[in-house]
Amino acid sequence: MKLTYFVLLSFLMLFMVDGNPQEPKSQAPKERPTRTRVVLLGTGTPVPDPDRSGPATAVVVGDSAYLVDFGPGVVRRAEAALLDRGVTALEPANLKVAFVTHLHSDHTAGYSDLIMTGWTAGRRTPIEVYGPTGLKSMTEHILEAYRIDIETRTIPTGDQRGNREGWRVNAHEIKSGVVYKDATVKVTAFPTQHAMESYGYRFDTPDRSVVISGDSSPTDETIKACKGCDVLIHEARAMEMFNQLPEDRRSFGAHNHTTSEQVAALATKAKPALLIVYHAWISWWPSIAPSANQPVVLTTGGFHSSPDVLQREIGARYSGHFVIGRDLDVY
């Protein structure tokens, strides 16, 4: 009798707790199927800096990676992001889609590395590359330069027997507008102001929007592209350094690059959730930018300031969230 009473009481308590025993319990919300990450593969300038590779940024959506620019060291930085940051989509063989902002050497010197190393690492399909006029010619010349290597690796009677597709490149010369779209991302190009034909890119994914300026002075097109974006990646240089440039370089910079004051004003109008400053003429190396926060003239002719100068100058004029990007940062 006591056992029967205990069973009935237990059932009643269960009913009181769960309500209707036939009604399924609520389930935890499912995670989003994708999570977009921004990986800074290179934040440097034309001046060699051991801490900073040439400009290169990866937008990673799930298992897919999309590169913007391929400066010196891009593939090795991608491998470092794989090994040190766990970004598996950046395995070199998986680097299959890339965009270039303009054809200056500091943004493109890693192009042959991207083509050839990705192929020898196992890429089995042609790489798709998008950029301004001149990209096709650059691509053809790179492939011709490595013709003997390609022939040696693909000869049927040879020992290497590399696949015959992974070295190929489909180069697309673009204009403003939507230039790429797949199941996870839409990429829109917009014109920027630099020394040659140049573009910035906006990436729209299921969970984030990312805008990358490339080299440019501040433009209304960048502000329009960034309206409501989650992340804006933009170049900048410290006013303290800029004001000490020789007149000819100051004139070039005024028309083709962005100062700390200007990036603060631009971001105030564009209102990104996060501003990432990259391709800044700064260095963490005292021999390149001394701790006294004064620019220094290198033997290469480059001028750099220390990062805290740039941080201070932007912070004095911009109230939004911003960071000074470093290689292998993930956001």
Briefly describe each language-model feature range.
Residues K2, Q22-V211, D220-T222, P286, ...:
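Binuclear metal-dependent hydrolase catalytic cores
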Residues D18-N20:
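Sec/Tat signal peptide C-region and signal peptidase I cleavage site
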Residues D207-S209, S217-R326:
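Cap/insert and terminal regions of metallo-dependent hydrolase folds
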Residues Y5-F15:
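Bacterial N-terminal signal peptides
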